Amino acid sequence: MSMSTHMPTPTPSDTKKMPPKEKKNKDDRPYKCTFCDKAFHRLEHQTRHIRTHTGEKPHACTFPGCVKRFSRSDELTRHLRIHTNPSSRKRKNKNQNMMINPNATTATTTGPAGMAIPTSNLPPGSYAIPNTAIPFSIDRNGNHVYHQPYPVYFVPHANGYMQPMVQTQGVTVVPNTDQQQHQQQQQYHQQQQQYQFQERPQHQQQQQTNIGTNNHLQQNGSAVFSLPSSPTMASAQTPNSGTSSSSESIKLAPLSIPNNISRPQQQQQQQQQQQQIPKSESSTSLYSDGNKLFSRPNSTLHSLGSSPENNNASGPLSGVPTPSFSNLNDYFQQKSNSNNSRLFNASSSSLSSLSGKIRSSSSTNLAGLQRLTPLTSTTNNTNNTTTSNTNNNNMTKPSIIPKQPSSTSLNLEFYNGNNQQQQNYHTHKKSRPNSPSQTPIHLSSSRKSANNSFIISPNETPLQTPLQSPQLKPYQDQPPTNVNINVSAPSDTFIGTAVTEKLNNISSIAGNGTQLPPIRSVLSFTSLVDYPDPKQKNVAPPVVDTTNVARGETNGSNGNNSNAKPMSLTNLLS
């Protein structure tokens, strides 16, 4: 029983001792708030509490793009967990809501200037990065200065990459890749076409060798030489509205072939396209006797001159033998028979044939103008022996025609009697003044004349006699002081009478040039007797007056033979 009495029993006073300890703890809070009655055991608790009164938030979020700030560090750490470990359940719910009803949500994000940007306008499946600013400096008041960047939205693309969508002043700009790709393809094709048309002389030869060389070898046809101004017979008989030049059709052929077609299919399509291409009107291709195609890489440079020397200068194509040019003569022969005139001279490599043809066939009034202005020629025949060779590549002058001495033609030019001017004047005469000249151009001719009308001169029309008798004019080999009149013995001073087809000494005429034979070789004066006046027997023979000899009158220096009969052609032949 004593044991039980010594056992202490709890009293209510013992239980009352615990609250004084709690009071003691309250009294031990030395850190009191200056703005309110709260006291804290630790200093950091007091500073955190004071920040609620001042609004200071020194703890900023370190995540890029986040601008949130906190007064407590524990709040910052809690906030960082949202960026580093977001809940996947919330994201899935948001995406499902956007897919089911994209227009129902009216969530907004803040813009650069504080304006709201509705996220419902964004395409489905896209997400927006909020407009966040990163502080880059602190002003003097201690405030942070931030950039205001534009929000960038990433829109999922069908090809698998994200396309940026920039927000500028509340207007969303979404680049349309389909339109851009289409425009870029069009610009690329246009640039390729322009580059090919500008570089046609360089690339045409390469493209023709690459595109179906065997198809060219299989083409059959006669020898055809196409010119821009003279289309081929096939194209002239059957005109086709869909015809195009061979160079353009060959160049545009590879552009129309898709890229996903295999190599044999491309070759088949190329052969089909080339079979559909008819003979062009502006190509300069030659089909030789071996059924092989030879195409000119530059049609403009060789369209005016078609000599074999120029055609051989370009060199043969790779894989295509050099064609023979023996069919050019047949081409020009056929053109001369059909059109009675040719536009080009096969043996000329310059513009002289073209310019001469244009001048001769353009109009008929130019020939009349040349009758009014006589054509002057050189007087020396020996200096002009190589005019046909030297003038082969030169332009012919319309006002001066140099003489061409010939050993097989008659030179029917007549000289003046003046000693000061030894010039030759051609006599022009056209049978039909208003009709254009249709004189064919021969392959052997080396140049074109300025006028194709009838000319007495044998330079243009050899072996033709004039239609009228020429005018009688005297010719003097010696000075007029030594010339004497002796009718009984005819002298060499009278030449230039009518020349007919009964001339006996043609070789002497050709050898002397334009000088005609003496009259005694043509006519016989043995039956003619002069009837001189008896008073004039002992008088010295007078000097011939060159101005009146053509009329048949001779006046002496003393003027005493005025009674003599006039010497005309009719009196001499009677």
Swiss-Prot record:
Zinc finger (C2H2-type): 31-53, 59-83
Region annotation (Disordered) ranges: 1-29, 83-119, 175-250, 262-470, 547-574
Stored InterPro entries: creA/MIG_C2H2-ZnF (IPR051007), Znf_C2H2_sf (IPR036236), Znf_C2H2_type (IPR013087)
Any one GO molecular function term: RNA polymerase II cis-regulatory region sequence-specific DNA binding
Biased composition (Polar residues): 209-240, 277-288, 296-335, 433-470, 564-574
Domain of life: Eukaryota
Keywords for this protein: Carbohydrate metabolism, DNA-binding, Metal-binding, Nucleus, Repeat, Repressor, Transcription, Transcription regulation, Zinc, Zinc-finger
Any Gene Ontology CC annotation: nucleus
Signal peptide coordinates: none
Entry function: Involved in glucose repression of glucose metabolism genes.
Protein's recorded name: Regulatory protein MIG1
Organism: Candida albicans
Phylogenetic placement of the source organism: Eukaryota, Fungi, Dikarya, Ascomycota, Saccharomycotina
Gene: MIG1
